[in-house]
């Protein structure tokens, strides 16, 4: 077991821990977070029971460091205990928020103290490869930047390491990294030194950048959060993932990027089909992910044509809020169908308005029927900040809410809810009709009207459309 430092992005901090825990489950990696109070004490790294006891403290500490206004963190460095370098690499290799992971050699509140502690290491962790292996030094700073002159001066102070191998800036065998948090208001250690183990997949954000996508619409979802949605769905090879509000397919691309097979549906087939040769299919060709795309169909989540015994590994969706796109469903027909259907020509079902609170209820009921045991429903839900309460979160006896991550705006928020299907062996045979979200009206009821109310207009300056974010 060793202590590792995670260098995280400073934005969307509410999503960091859920992603890390989900990736650990996907890769079957065991880890423990370390609270700041223990950062200068790495002697406990092999004490498994103590690590577990400190885990909850570290989580609370990280959550308290998140700004409530913009969901940023003042300290993007997090320490964790992991079993091996290989586990550390596998753990964060597909992470969207983790820039890199480093095996930590020393931590100090200043460079002077760092060097003192480094010289006390016996044996030094780099002794086994200091003679013949190529290497280089890199810097990661938060809060400011180091000039090249400053970097060279700091590197020269590590001469006591007596590294005798050649320097290789392009293909080194070992990378030593100095990480520094130079924010004045940050308490605790300011300087970290370690050995680079691996990087995340933040370059995927550029891959799926909406500005580079051939076909988008007004509901196309931000690339970074689309990738996180796929992470929370545990998208991976061999998985089948469905989006019942597919729109222009943002979630399908990112789920397929991680190897899952995807399909989607929407009440309005025009967005899926596109025009002038640009469509969901053309985007799959652009990303070279066509083998993972099954198909799309025009349909309604309340009248889904998928066969009942088709179980899904995950359902991902961003239901229409009624702001950029209206929510509709197929209306019940009060008339009998004509006897001779051939004489009627094409038939288009009548649609009616769909209240978002009713839609959410239908989604979780659908998910409880169609998910495999342990499958996930990953759902984006808008909430009004001043009215938000625990009753806003939908519940179902067969689904367990495991994550509730928030993206705050001015007067409203967008929450990423992650539910997990409980084992069917424990299903109640007497369950008939579920109460609609605890029999209380959630704050997202009539969300459109609230959004465009006086409070809503004040927040309209906040970029709403994921296309513009």
UniProtKB/Swiss-Prot annotation:
<comment type="function">
    <text>Catalytic subunit of an S-adenosyl-L-methionine-dependent tRNA methyltransferase complex that mediates the methylation of the guanosine nucleotide at position 10 (m2G10) in tRNAs.</text>
</comment>
<dbReference type="GO" id="GO:0005634">
    <property type="term" value="C:nucleus"/>
</dbReference>
<dbReference type="GO" id="GO:0005737">
    <property type="term" value="C:cytoplasm"/>
</dbReference>
<protein>
    <recommendedName>
        <fullName>tRNA (guanine(10)-N(2))-methyltransferase</fullName>
        <ecNumber>2.1.1.214</ecNumber>
    </recommendedName>
</protein>
<dbReference type="InterPro" id="IPR000241">
    <property type="entry name" value="RlmKL-like_Mtase"/>
</dbReference>
<dbReference type="InterPro" id="IPR002052">
    <property type="entry name" value="DNA_methylase_N6_adenine_CS"/>
</dbReference>
<dbReference type="InterPro" id="IPR029063">
    <property type="entry name" value="SAM-dependent_MTases_sf"/>
</dbReference>
<dbReference type="GO" id="GO:0160102">
    <property type="term" value="F:tRNA (guanine(10)-N2)-methyltransferase activity"/>
</dbReference>
<keyword id="KW-0949">S-adenosyl-L-methionine</keyword>
<keyword id="KW-0819">tRNA processing</keyword>
<dbReference type="GO" id="GO:0008168">
    <property type="term" value="F:methyltransferase activity"/>
</dbReference>
<keyword id="KW-0808">Transferase</keyword>
<comment type="similarity">
    <text>Belongs to the class I-like SAM-binding methyltransferase superfamily. TRM11 methyltransferase family.</text>
</comment>
<dbReference type="GO" id="GO:0043528">
    <property type="term" value="C:tRNA (m2G10) methyltransferase complex"/>
</dbReference>
<dbReference type="GO" id="GO:0000049">
    <property type="term" value="F:tRNA binding"/>
</dbReference>
<dbReference type="InterPro" id="IPR016691">
    <property type="entry name" value="tRNA_mtfrase_TRM11"/>
</dbReference>
<keyword id="KW-0963">Cytoplasm</keyword>
<keyword id="KW-0489">Methyltransferase</keyword>
<dbReference type="Pfam" id="PF01170">
    <property type="entry name" value="UPF0020"/>
</dbReference>
<keyword id="KW-0539">Nucleus</keyword>
<dbReference type="GO" id="GO:0005829">
    <property type="term" value="C:cytosol"/>
</dbReference>
<keyword id="KW-0820">tRNA-binding</keyword>
<keyword id="KW-0694">RNA-binding</keyword>
<dbReference type="GO" id="GO:0002940">
    <property type="term" value="P:tRNA N2-guanine methylation"/>
</dbReference>
<comment type="subunit">
    <text>Interacts with trm112.</text>
</comment>
